[in-house]
Amino acid sequence: MSFWTQKKVVVTGGRGFIGSHLVERLLEAGANVKVCDSTYSNGAMNDLATRDVEFHDRDLADPENCRKICRGADVVMHLAAKIRGVGYNVKHHGEMFFSNAVMNLNMMEAARVAGVSRFLCVSTVGVYPKDCRVPTPEEDGFKGEPEESGYGYGWAKRQAEVQARCYKSEYGMKIAIVRPYNVYGPRMDFNPETAPVVSSQIRKVLEAKDVLTVWGDGEQSRSFTYVSDEVIGMMLAVEKYPEADPLNIGTSEEIKIKDLVQLIVRLSGKNLQIVFDTSKPAGAARRCPDISKAKRLIGYEPEVRMEEGLQKTIDWYLEPAAVVR
């Protein structure tokens, strides 16, 4: 019998990109799922409308809402977060810190009071400083300051990790902490103002006529995690390592931005001239997680290679029924 069979699981942020995929995987594993979310991100839950999922629209800044949603739950998986684009983040560090810190504090405390058996704290790679080692081990998460572009958000997530450690120490609460790494796949954000690298480049390629302009020289490298690998990692962490100790959930497969763009162009069947604008910011030279800890402790092993994941994402974007913002 699966760990998840008949478990009553609350997923906050379950209408969103990663959350909706997690809900699907939990249902397949035999869990009874309750989704709490105040948004309808990308219509991500449309294809689950007929499934046996209980939906709640709740503001998690209200402690009483959090207590209500946690009552009777076996597991709480807290994915809800206020996330915006870099341009917004750099002007609203206080708002990003407060909004996320309040949700994290409320949900973990509500889960503790409800006596849930497991809690998932979803952190971020934004906890890492700009000068962290690459591949980046988990212990670098509290060295120096979070990157300036996501300073408020990064500190809110660091605070959540500290809260998890404190709750494990005093209350013996079983909490898993994961740090997702550049997740992509169907239902991700394609809004030009807020889209991350993969969806931004897919949209630009598919909408381009003859010339595609890419910021920077394209030499910077990143690793990207397909969403199905990410949610499996989250579930494994809850099941096997609820020790309030962070795990990188990503992939060690790196790709240069110029190669990523060329791959998207090839998969989309377009014939474009690619121009690199070196006057524009390109970000850090290299970003990649050390996932050896997750491999060792929970048996995590990413399975979807970049080309396969990109093709699935492009195919979804081109579907007439896809809801794209």
Task: Locate predicted features.
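N-terminal Rossmann NAD(P)H-binding glycine-rich loop of SDR-like oxidoreductase domains
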Residues: 9-29
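Conserved Rossmann-fold NAD(P)-dependent oxidoreductase catalytic core, especially the SDR/UDP-sugar
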Residues: 78, 105-150
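Conserved glycine-rich Rossmann-like NAD(P)H-binding loop of the short-chain dehydrogenase/reductase
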Residues: 31-40
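NAD(P)H-binding glycine-rich loop region in Rossmannoid oxidoreductase-like domains
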Residues: 57-99, 110-113, 130
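SDR active-site strand-loop-helix element
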Residues: 12, 36, 76-82, 119-125, ...
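Active-site helix of classical SDR
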Residues: 152, 156-159
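C-terminal substrate-binding subdomain of Rossmann-fold SDR/epimerase-dehydratase oxidoreductases
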Residues: 24-29, 58, 207-325
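NAD(P)-dependent short-chain dehydrogenase/reductase
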Residues: 131-140, 162-239, 252-254, 261-267
